[in-house]
């Protein structure tokens, strides 16, 4: 069912900023091609308390932003609905959002979005539907008629579940999605306020350790390697600060290369802005950190959104992407 523009704008504003080997050496910044410094040197960046925000913290701690002439302040977003007002009034420059959220914002007209860098792509084990061990639900088909907790409606969780349930002949309107914050989902399951919950890491591992079991991995099959989230700014901001945007992209690219090759680098920073301990970061399931920005990959998200009625019309993701300098 396709929702109206006003409703979709509200959904976009409240959408969740989601979601997520050893020893690679950083090759350093690319030589040449830089004329003048960044137009704006002090940036406020909105991050979510999930592993996919790690590259910004890596870039900051390793001095990559400093080398690009940038000083970065991070703001952990606990209430997703506060993000777009900050972006639109200029108190936040760049933010991380799920691609479902970013495409929704673009389609709703709430803002024109430019994607600066990919953040995380899906991998098996990082998100899925869980039930308590004693639940009568034994497989995805059993979710028909179930009440499922999600962190946000019309976002990554509901869309990825819809793609999987379709294969089991369960339509989205045959389940009931209810909003429960990730932190409260396990309690909702234990108290039987919901039948199942869609969780992401690190909540997924914690729930399984506390007596829940995985019923459906939502990062396989139709959503295998699906792009999850990325760093974005408004079209207006990017047009006014092209050198700043490019500097941010270069710094994050270097951090992404470290994140994809060395789990220990991630373990250094994730505990700084989440409640996940270092040893858990070393062992938990993790998505992949793309080192390129590919519109074709992200288009998969927009196409799934259109298929399941999240969009009024198809969105061309290529028009939203800002090529990474040097690529």
Feature roles, as predicted:
Residues 18-21:
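C-terminal motif of bacterial Sec signal peptides marking the signal peptidase cleavage site
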Residues 67, 121-122, 220-224, 288-296, ...:
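Short, solvent-exposed loop/beta-turn-alpha elements that line the ligand-binding surface or hinge
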Residues 100, 109, 178, 183-269:
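Pocket-lining segment of extracytoplasmic ligand-binding domains
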């Amino acid at each position: 069912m396709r929702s109206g523009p006003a409703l979709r704008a509200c959904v976009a504003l409240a959408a969740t900023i989601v979601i997520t080997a050893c020893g690679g050496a950083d090759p350093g910044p690319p030589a040449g091609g830089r004329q003048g410094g960044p137009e704006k040197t002090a940036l406020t960046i909105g991050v979510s308390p999930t592993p996919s925000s790690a590259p910004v913290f890596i870039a900051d701690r390793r001095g990559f932003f400093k080398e690009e002439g940038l000083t970065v302040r991070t703001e952990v977003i606990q209430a997703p609905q506060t993000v777009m007002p900050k972006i639109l009034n200029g108190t936040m420059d760049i933010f991380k959002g799920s691609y479902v959220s970013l495409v929704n914002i673009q389609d709703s007209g709430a803002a024109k979005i430019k994607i600066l860098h990919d953040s995380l792509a899906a991998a098996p084990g990082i998100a899925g539907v869980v039930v308590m061990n004693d639940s009568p639900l034994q497989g995805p088909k059993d979710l028909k008629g179930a009440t499922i907790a999600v962190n946000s409606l019309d976002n990554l969780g509901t869309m990825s579940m819809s793609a999987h349930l379709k294969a089991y002949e369960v339509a989205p309107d045959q389940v009931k999605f209810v909003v429960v914050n990730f932190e409260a989902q396990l309690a909702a399951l234990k108290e039987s306020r919901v039948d199942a919950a869609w969780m992401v890491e690190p909540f997924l591992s914690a729930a399984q350790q506390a007596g829940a079991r995985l019923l459906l991995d939502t990062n396989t099959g139709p959503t295998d390697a699906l792009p999850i989230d990325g760093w974005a700014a408004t079209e207006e901001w990017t047009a006014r600060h092209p050198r700043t945007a490019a500097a941010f992209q270069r710094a994050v690219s270097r951090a992404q290369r470290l994140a994809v090759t060395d789990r220990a680098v991630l373990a250094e920073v994730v505990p700084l802005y989440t409640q996940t301990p270092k040893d858990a970061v070393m062992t938990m399931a993790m998505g992949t950190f793309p080192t390129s920005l590919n519109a074709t990959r992200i288009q998969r998200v927009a196409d799934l959104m259109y298929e399941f009625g999240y969009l009024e019309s198809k969105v061309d993701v290529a028009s939203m992407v800002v090529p990474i300098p040097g690529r």
